[in-house]
Amino acid sequence: MMSKLGVLLTICLLLFPLTALPMDGDEPANRPVERMQDNISSEQYPLFEKRRDCCTPPKKCKDRQCKPQRCCAGR
């Protein structure tokens, strides 16, 4: 009885992961072009500057998070 149960358990454990895993074509790692298109860039968000700790528009430069010496000096 125990050997039959062990065989059944082994079969179930071997079959379940094979059907539960996505196929190779469905994995986003295999589609770099689509992955790059989904990338969020600063061109889509005009209030975000690429420079770290910078804020726009200039009136926000008085915020504590903004670094005025780097961002607002030239404005």
Curated annotation (Swiss-Prot):
Modified residue annotations for Alanine amide: 73
Signal peptide segment: 1-20
GO MF terms held by the record: sodium channel inhibitor activity; toxin activity
Propiece span(s): 21-51
Pfam families referenced in this protein's UniProt entry, alphabetically: Mu-conotoxin
Changes after translation: Hydroxylated; hydroxylations improve the ability to block Nav1.4/SCN4A sodium channels but does not affect folding.
Tissues and organs where the protein is expressed, per its UniProt entry: Expressed by the venom duct.
This protein's record includes keyword tRNA processing: no
Result of altering residue 64 to A: 200-fold decrease in activity on Nav channels (probably Nav1.4/SCN4A) from rat diaphragm
Keywords: Amidation, Cleavage on pair of basic residues, Disulfide bond, Hydroxylation, Ion channel impairing toxin, Neurotoxin, Secreted, Signal, Toxin, Voltage-gated sodium channel impairing toxin
Effect of mutating residue 53 to A: 2-fold decrease in activity on Nav channels (probably Nav1.4/SCN4A) from rat diaphragm
Annotated site residue numbers, Important for binding sodium channel: 64
InterPro entries: Conotoxin_mu-typ (IPR008036)
Cellular localization per UniProt: Secreted
Disulphides: 54-66, 55-71, 61-72
Remaining remarks: Negative results: does not or only weakly blocks rNav1.3/SCN3A, rNav1.5/SCN5A, rNav1.7/SCN9A (IC(50)=6.0 uM and >100 uM), and rNav1.8/SCN10A.
Function statement: Mu-conotoxins block voltage-gated sodium channels (Nav). This toxin potently blocks rat Nav1.4/SCN4A (IC(50)= 19-110 nM). It also moderately blocks rNav1.1/SCN1A (Kd=260 nM), rNav1.2/SCN2A (IC(50)=2.7-17.8 uM), and mNav1.6/SCN8A (IC(50)=680 nM). The inhibition is reversible. In vivo, induces paralysis to an isolated skeletal muscle preparation from frog (cutaneous pectoralis) within a few minutes.
Family to which this protein belongs: Belongs to the conotoxin M superfamily.
Domain description: The cysteine framework is III (CC-C-C-CC).
UniProt name for this protein: Mu-conotoxin GIIIA
